[in-house]
Amino acid sequence: MAGNAGVAEAWTVSEATRYIKQLLEDDPHLPEIWIRGELSNFKQHTRGHMYFTIKDEGSRMQAVMFAGYNRFLRFKPENGMNVLIRGEINVYEPYGQYQFYAKEMQPDGIGSLFAEYERLKKALEAEGLFAEERKRPIPRFPTHIAIITSPTGAVIRDMMTTLKRRYPQIRVTLFPVLVQGEGAPLSISRALEQASMANIFDVVIVARGGGSIEELWAFNEEMVARAIAEAAVPVISAVGHETDFTISDFAADRRAPTPTAAAEFAVPDARELMEHIGHLKKRLERSLVEQVKTRRRELERLKRSYAFRYPVQLVHQKEQQLDGLMERLNRAMQIKLEQKTLAFKHMNQAILRQHPATRVSQLQKERRQNHARLVRAMAAETQRKRQSLSAVIQQLQLLSPLAVMDRGYSLVYKDEALVKTAKDVEIEDDIVVKLADGNLHCQVVGKREMKNGGESNG
């Protein structure tokens, strides 16, 4: 009977498997561990999942790495490769088989590479090879760029697309090199020397796409770092992804997170340049308009001041002074216009030396038209002000006492005071009679005052 009771309490295979699975999941050490071993029986499913065996001299274990994790791998796993994998041990219930579920994988032996990387980095840094004062500025408007990279692949295509889109007139020379493997450091160093000796480049870009630390190692070699530092022109390093830092990045004059970003650093955006030129043109026009307004206000002030404060005999002198001011104004405006035009021309030449000729011709034509309009406007304004001044002078001459005297009238002064009535003088007073063409010195011998329309003898 006891034997029958034990049979009644027997577990199913599924129950036993789930129990073992639960034990593994509850174990504090198994959910997150690192395992070192050799890959074998490696295969990748069409859906992206990787299935393989991880083994050493004494044992082996089935493992799987799902596509959601293995898409971040920076190397291609192969049979016989020694690796480090991180993940958890659990049970695959359908087969009652325990296996390793990998979340991260990297080639074993990277530790020695990192140690060599840190050693060389510290040595070159202590030597001053990475010092900021050694860094050279990247030219704003290069005409010829050298690119040192693999002649095939997406890197050179993406860079050329970016360069031609942003700055169509740029010239590019490709130095094809090995970017990984045993001969890569020497290939890259020789290309840098050739680019320096050519003496025709404004900037050099050293580029490579992403990869594992082993694939990028050529750019961590001392030979390459020194070739970059000794280059005759500024060097932009664009190796790997944004998170990758190589010795070449520290030795270069500028680091770009990606090859495409390096192309953007190397050349300006032609559209932005045209917008900048447009802004400068508007600023020039506003400056000229303000100068004209200022000179007009000065002219109005001079007109009001000179027309009413000075005697008529000074009008002609002030008219000459006004002519001088107008000449100075014209010269100043001409000089200002020439200075602005020359500065604008120099800027066009510096920025758009190789810009399409039709655009340059159009800008020059607009500048000439603006200049001609400004000159015509100033000439018309000057003529109008002269006519206005002549009219004011004629009005002043009509109101002048001297003009009245020309018609036969005279002024009588006694002791330099104007005599207005007969009561202002007495018999035997000396008086001065001022005529249009001279003065008469007289003595009063008699006077007759007018009273109520009649006469009275004095």
Swiss-Prot record:
<comment type="subunit">
    <text>Heterooligomer composed of large and small subunits.</text>
</comment>
<dbReference type="InterPro" id="IPR020579">
    <property type="entry name" value="Exonuc_VII_lsu_C"/>
</dbReference>
<dbReference type="Pfam" id="PF13742">
    <property type="entry name" value="tRNA_anti_2"/>
</dbReference>
<dbReference type="Pfam" id="PF02601">
    <property type="entry name" value="Exonuc_VII_L"/>
</dbReference>
<dbReference type="GO" id="GO:0009318">
    <property type="term" value="C:exodeoxyribonuclease VII complex"/>
</dbReference>
<protein>
    <recommendedName>
        <fullName>Exodeoxyribonuclease 7 large subunit</fullName>
        <ecNumber>3.1.11.6</ecNumber>
    </recommendedName>
</protein>
<dbReference type="GO" id="GO:0005737">
    <property type="term" value="C:cytoplasm"/>
</dbReference>
<dbReference type="InterPro" id="IPR025824">
    <property type="entry name" value="OB-fold_nuc-bd_dom"/>
</dbReference>
<keyword id="KW-0269">Exonuclease</keyword>
<dbReference type="GO" id="GO:0006308">
    <property type="term" value="P:DNA catabolic process"/>
</dbReference>
<keyword id="KW-0378">Hydrolase</keyword>
<dbReference type="GO" id="GO:0008855">
    <property type="term" value="F:exodeoxyribonuclease VII activity"/>
</dbReference>
<keyword id="KW-0963">Cytoplasm</keyword>
<comment type="similarity">
    <text>Belongs to the XseA family.</text>
</comment>
<comment type="function">
    <text>Bidirectionally degrades single-stranded DNA into large acid-insoluble oligonucleotides, which are then degraded further into small acid-soluble oligonucleotides.</text>
</comment>
<dbReference type="GO" id="GO:0003676">
    <property type="term" value="F:nucleic acid binding"/>
</dbReference>
<keyword id="KW-0540">Nuclease</keyword>
<dbReference type="InterPro" id="IPR003753">
    <property type="entry name" value="Exonuc_VII_L"/>
</dbReference>
